[in-house]
């Protein structure tokens, strides 16, 4: 049960992170300023440590993540809606840096965030891009391959 509670708190943290990363993308405010604003407004029952780690991690690596993601997109990154760009950055960061979070959890959470905050059908785009991104993360290859082979066994 504890893991379930922790998972829900992380899900809520991701929801706040998308909002914070959107603000970062649109305003260019620093991670410190955004963190202060979110803490002052009250974050509710979320994993605050996870929120803090990821707001700084994603913003510190934004240019690198953007470069990696750009190679997988069908259009320039700047043409993506800031919400989708924020979700992609968050998902890419988790896939590459938070290896204890299962691959499928990162993808599923990102898809749900796109359904909640993104444009109609953006969840499909997010799913495809992050799945391709996961293939570029060497340490995710075994986990991703295992999932794909199990899917193939069912067909």
Curated annotation (Swiss-Prot):
Job description of the protein: Involved in transcription antitermination. Required for transcription of ribosomal RNA (rRNA) genes. Binds specifically to the boxA antiterminator sequence of the ribosomal RNA (rrn) operons.
Source organism, top-level taxon: Bacteria
Segments passing through the bilayer: none
Protein name: Transcription antitermination protein NusB
Keywords: RNA-binding, Transcription, Transcription antitermination, Transcription regulation
GO MF term list: RNA binding
RNA-binding found in the keyword field: yes
Family: Belongs to the NusB family.
The keyword Zinc is assigned to this record: no
Gene Ontology annotations for the cellular component aspect, listed alphabetically: cytosol
Lineage: Bacteria, Pseudomonadati, Pseudomonadota, Gammaproteobacteria, Chromatiales
GO biological process: DNA-templated transcription termination; transcription antitermination
Matching InterPro entries: NusB-like_sf, NusB_fam, NusB_RsmB_TIM44
């Amino acid at each position: 049960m504890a893991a379930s509670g922790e998972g829900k708190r992380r899900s809520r943290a991701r929801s706040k992170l998308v909002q914070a990363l959107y603000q970062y993308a649109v305003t260019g405010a620093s991670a410190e300023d955004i963190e202060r604003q979110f803490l002052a407004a009250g974050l509710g029952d979320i994993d605050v440590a996870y929120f803090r780690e990821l707001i700084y991690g994603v913003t510190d690596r934004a240019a690198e993540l953007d470069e990696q993601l750009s190679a997988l997109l069908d259009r320039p990154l700047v043409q993506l809606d800031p919400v989708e760009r924020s979700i992609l950055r968050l998902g890419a960061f988790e896939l590459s840096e938070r290896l204890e979070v299962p691959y499928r959890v990162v993808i599923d959470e990102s898809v749900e965030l796109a359904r909640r905050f993104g444009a109609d059908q953006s969840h499909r785009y997010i799913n495809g891009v992050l799945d391709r991104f996961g293939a570029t993360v060497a340490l995710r290859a075994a986990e991703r391959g295992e999932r794909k082979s199990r899917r193939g066994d069912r067909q």
